[in-house]
Every structure is written in structure tokens, then in C-alpha cells.
């Protein structure tokens, strides 16, 4: 029998590659024991990039979620790992050194064992400091090679990076094939090169299933020494996500590898529970197109997880481009026409901006440059005339060293615009920030939290954390969720049917008198404007719902009927209403 292969369930990435949000703390705590019961996973990806930010956007505390999800795995010896964007840590832009260092201390205390550190440019300068801080914080540093196909991304290129990372203290290497475009034979050779030189180094393969190469890649890397394979489970496996663990284990077992058995009863429970989370609310933010694989992405190399946002961008751009074409007397473009044009433009742009690996955030920059080029060429302005500072920052070297050469046209354009190229170590441009955030927390009377985790959260995601603390994030989220639900219903119902459906389980709150409506009153010294409540707000029976200023100058208190959840508002703060008008609808809790 061949060597033993272990498996990781990338539960965080399953959701990130499918939609906008992550499960709540209670949902994660509910499914963790079932994942353990499956018996086939030695690792689980519990948190990391995007996980914490979208928790805050949903009005939830990510620290509570991480602790609740990691704890059951810690108790049984299943290792937990997180995604770490190196210089950018958990967000999309650079993070000061002191905040990055604090992250590893906090995450280790919360129960995260391994940090997968990657840099979108494969610039080791953005990774190596994190290796040191991870070890100091008590975590295992696993360093990633961002896989792509280009003339500069050779076996020697990747081996040179692996050499530097291992010399700096990396204990594991991940082959991170985010777009799933790594050629299987190439990945097998790379795995063998690393294993032959560093037999003690653990190699973990992470490949998305988008263009259909990932199963062949898994077989190649395992036959050449890989130790651990990232997998998914239904209903979020395949498509633009990851291969399903059932298929991977079946393939490797028949190849002669030692693999664990799957408790299929537990698998079906985890499958049903994940579907339950989708049905409850997460599915309203999942693009159905992410369930579809596409070989079209092999040519341009863009990650499949971008397809949803990319198609939305194309939809808006198509109308603008077709308006221009109509004025010129040219034939309009279909979505398919425009998609192929975009893929072709990415293939044109990518080498000219130096072949940055097409992973977050550089895949977005290359896509956006290409999309803007399509528009400006239709306008007769040529290419590269609509690039923002983020796009230029990548080209100029402000995010790290670009693997290839920048096209002379762009070098000349940068000079004309007074932009300067740099090879500076990006993290040295940042100043420490924790003292400023401590001052802000002290002034607001906010606790630093267990192991300084709340301080870390503010420092990592300042805007989102402030909105979370004020309650605005939860209000915004519930309103977005209601809009998403209405949109889904509205796609199959007439407006009248939609209103009837929404109000079937709801009580109408009716104005008892005519007058002017007031949803709330502000206390002395409050500077926030009074506004109507957020959709989803909970009321108890008899609560004051709103107030009406009657024509005779007295306020009439309107009670919240039998209580429940606010589902629709028909009257804004300060508006005039008539007696008998419906102010809002409250949906009672199920008996």
C-alpha cells in the first residue's frame, strides 16, 4: 500500500467561494460535532480571510464564532487552520506590523493551530515576517505558493520561493491553486522537487474545481509525495468550489493509498445541515452560477469564485458598451460575446502588467483593467486610460515585486503621469497602529476583550467593527436580507401576490388617528437623526411601536400588537398619515 493521505475540510472556503457570507456562531457550533463524526478529516479550515469581515457585516462577533467553531476540533485533536493574506492579513489592503503580530497571538488563543500565509504576488518579503510572528504567537506557519501558468511561473521559480520560505522557518508548504488552472503534470513535478529536497516538510494541496483539472492534479501530487488534500462536501462541493471528499477518497483508495473511511451517516447529516443553513439565509447571497464548472477560465486564468461578480460587472458594462455601439451603427454584443472579449483582453493585459498570480486582490485588478479597456476602446480612447491607484499600485510595485516585466507602454505612461516605480519592502511603509486603536477603545469605553481580541478586531477591520458596535451593521444586514428575500419571491410572483405572501403571516399596524408619525425620540444632546426602525427588528407584545402627533397636539402611542418581527414599513419618520392607514407589518413568531 502507498503512503497515508490526510484530508482537510475547507469549510470556510466552501462558503467564501459560493457566496458573500459565512455561517453564524450557532450554526458553526452545531455542525462541528457532525464534521468530527464523519471521521475522515485530520484538519478543518475554520476561519481567516473574509470570515471575520463578513461576520462583522452581518452584525455578528467573529471572535465568538472562531472560538465556538475551533473548540470542538481542539478537544479531539483535529487541527484547525486559517487563511492569512500575509501583508494584508485578513483584509484586502496592507496591515501594520504590530497588528499582524497581534493577530497570531489572538488566533492561537482562540484555537486556530495553523496559519496558511500567502502573498498574491509570491513576494517572500510579504510572507517571511509572518512566519516569525506566527511562531511567536504559538501557531504553525504554513506558507503557500500561489499557482498559475505563465512563461515566468516555472518549476525553478516556485522552487526558489519554497527554498526561501523554508529557510525562513516555514514548517509546511501549500500549493494554492485558487483558479484550478495548475496543470496536473506540472504540480506533480513541483511536489516531487520540494519533497526530494525537504522530505520532512508537509505539503498540502488546495485546488478549486472550476475548469475540471483538480482531480487529475490531486492524483499527480499524491503520487509525488503530497501529504494532505483540501476537500469540500455537498451541497457546496464542485462547481467553482472544491472536489468532494467522497470522490477524492474513492480515487486515491483505488490508486492504492491509505485513506480514512467516511462515516456516510454523518456525511449525510453534515450535508443536510449545510443545506439547512443555505435555506435559512445564506442561500440568498449565493450566486447559482457558482455551481457551474467552466473550462473557459483555463485561457484567462481568473479564479472561478470571481465569476459571479464578474458577470454582474459585465451586465452593467454591456448596456453602456451597446449604447456606444448603437450610436456608431455597430451590432450589439451579447453577454457571451462580451465574456469572450473580456477573456481575450485579460490574456492581453496579464503579461503586460508582469504576470501577477491571479489571486486576491490582483485577479480583481487585472480583471478591472481589462474591463475598463473594453469600454475605453469602444469609446475610441485606447487602453490603460481608466486605472485607479490600486491598479497602479500593483504595477508600480507598492504591493510587492511583480514576477515579470512591466510592458514599456505602461512604463512610459507611468512617467507621463508622474508615477514612480519602487522595489521597497511594502511593510516598511506602514507605521504601527495599535496605540491609536487603544486610545479609540478607551475613549468609547470599549473593552479590549479576551486576549485583546476586540482590540485586534477594531485594528484589522476599523470601519466594519465600528458599525458592528453601533448596531448599524445588523440593521444594514437585516435590510439587505429582506431585499434578497423579496427579490427571490418577486422573480416568481406578481407584485400583488408578493404583497399577499409577505403579509400572510403578519399583523398590520394601523394608525388609530390621523397625524404625523414619529418612530423614536432623541434624548437631549443626541446628534443622530431619528429614523424608522430596521427591517427585522423584534418587538414584544405591548411594546411601544411608534407615536403619532395628532392634530390637537397630543401624542398617541401605537402598540406593537402581539409582537414579532418587523417585515415592512409603509410610513417614514415625520410623514403624514390618515386614520386607518397601514403603518407597518409585524410577523408573529411561529406557535
Located regions from the model:
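C-terminal helical cap(s) of enzyme catalytic domains, especially alpha/beta-barrels
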Residues: 237-262
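Glycine-rich phosphate-binding active-site loops on the catalytic face of alpha/beta enzymes
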Residues: 117, 177, 224-243
Amino acid at each position: 500500500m502507498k503512503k497515508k493521505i490526510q484530508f482537510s475540510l475547507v469549510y470556510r472556503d466552501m462558503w467564501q467561494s459560493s457566496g458573500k457570507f459565512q455561517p453564524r456562531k450557532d450554526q458553526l457550533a452545531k455542525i462541528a460535532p457532525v464534521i468530527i463524526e464523519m471521521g475522515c478529516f485530520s484538519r478543518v479550515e475554520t476561519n481567516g480571510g473574509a470570515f471575520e469581515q463578513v461576520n462583522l457585516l452581518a452584525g455578528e462577533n467573529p471572535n465568538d464564532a472562531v472560538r465556538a467553531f475551533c473548540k470542538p476540533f481542539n478537544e479531539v485533536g483535529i487541527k484547525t487552520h486559517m487563511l492569512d493574506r500575509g501583508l494584508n492579513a485578513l483584509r484586502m489592503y496592507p496591515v501594520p506590523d504590530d497588528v499582524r503580530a497581534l493577530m497570531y497571538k489572538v488566533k492561537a488563543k482562540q484555537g486556530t493551530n495553523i496559519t496558511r500565509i500567502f502573498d498574491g504576488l509570491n513576494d517572500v518579503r510579504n510572507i517571511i515576517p509572518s512566519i516569525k510572528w506566527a511562531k511567536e504567537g504559538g501557531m504553525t506557519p504554513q506558507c503557500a505558493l500561489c499557482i498559475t501558468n505563465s512563461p515566468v511561473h516555472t518549476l525553478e521559480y516556485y522552487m526558489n520561493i519554497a527554498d526561501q520560505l523554508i529557510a525562513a522557518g516555514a514548517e509546511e508548504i501549500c500549493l494554492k491553486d485558487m483558479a484550478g488552472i495548475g496543470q496536473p503534470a506540472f504540480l506533480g513535478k513541483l511536489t516531487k522537487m520540494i519533497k526530494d529536497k525537504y522530505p520532512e516538510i508537509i505539503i498540502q494541496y488546495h485546488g478549486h474545481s472550476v475548469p475540471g483539472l483538480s482531480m487529475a492534479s490531486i492524483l499527480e501530487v499524491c503520487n509525488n509525495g503530497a501529504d494532505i488534500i483540501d476537500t469540500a462536501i455537498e451541497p457546496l462541493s464542485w462547481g467553482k468550489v472544491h472536489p468532494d471528499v467522497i470522490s477524492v477518497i474513492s480515487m486515491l483508495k483505488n490508486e492504492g493509498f491509505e485513506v480514512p473511511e467516511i462515516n456516510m451517516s454523518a456525511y449525510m447529516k453534515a450535508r443536510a445541515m449545510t443545506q439547512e443553513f443555505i435555506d435559512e439565509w445564506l442561500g440568498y447571497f449565493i450566486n447559482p452560477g457558482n455551481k457551474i464548472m467552466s473550462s473557459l477560465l483555463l485561457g484567462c486564468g481568473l479564479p472561478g469564485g470571481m465569476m459571479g461578480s464578474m458577470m454582474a460587472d459585465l451586465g452593467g458594462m454591456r448596456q453602456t458598451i451597446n449604447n456606444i455601439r448603437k450610436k456608431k451603427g455597430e451590432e450589439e454584443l451579447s453577454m457571451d460575446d462580451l465574456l469572450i472579449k473580456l477573456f481575450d483582453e485579460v490574456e492581453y493585459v496579464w503579461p503586460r502588467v508582469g504576470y501577477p498570480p491571479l489571486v486576491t486582490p490582483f485577479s480583481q485588478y487585472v480583471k478591472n483593467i481589462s474591463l475598463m479597456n473594453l469600454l475605453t476602446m469602444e469609446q475610441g480612447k485606447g487602453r490603460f486610460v481608466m486605472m485607479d491607484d490600486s491598479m497602479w499600485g500593483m504595477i508600480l510595485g507598492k504591493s510587492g515585486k511583480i514576477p515579470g516585466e512591466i510592458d514599456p507602454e505602461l512604463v512610459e505612461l507611468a512617467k507621463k503621469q508622474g508615477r514612480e516605480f519602487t522595489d521597497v519592502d511594502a511593510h516598511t511603509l506602514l507605521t504601527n497602529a495599535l496605540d491609536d486603536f487603544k486610545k479609540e477603545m478607551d475613549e468609547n469605553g470599549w473593552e479590549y476583550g479576551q486576549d485583546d481580541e476586540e482590540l485586534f478586531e477594531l485594528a484589522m477591520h476599523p470601519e466594519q467593527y465600528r458599525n458592528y458596535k453601533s448596531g448599524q451593521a445588523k440593521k444594514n444586514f437585516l435590510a439587505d436580507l429582506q431585499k434578497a428575500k423579496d427579490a427571490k419571491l418577486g422573480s416568481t410572483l406578481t407584485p400583488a401576490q408578493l404583497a399577499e405572501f409577505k403579509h400572510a403571516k403578519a399583523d398590520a399596524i394601523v394608525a388609530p388617528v390621523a397625524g404625523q408619525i414619529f418612530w423614536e425620540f432623541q434624548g437631549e444632546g443626541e446628534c443622530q437623526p431619528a429614523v424608522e426602525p430596521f427591517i427585522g427588528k423584534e418587538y414584544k407584545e405591548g411594546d411601544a411601536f411608534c407615536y403619532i402627533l395628532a392634530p390637537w397636539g397630543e401624542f398617541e402611542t401605537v402598540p406593537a400588537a402581539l409582537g414579532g418581527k418587523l417585515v415592512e414599513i409603509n410610513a417614514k419618520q415625520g410623514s403624514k398619515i390618515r386614520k386607518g392607514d397601514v403603518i407597518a407589518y409585524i410577523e408573529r413568531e411561529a406557535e
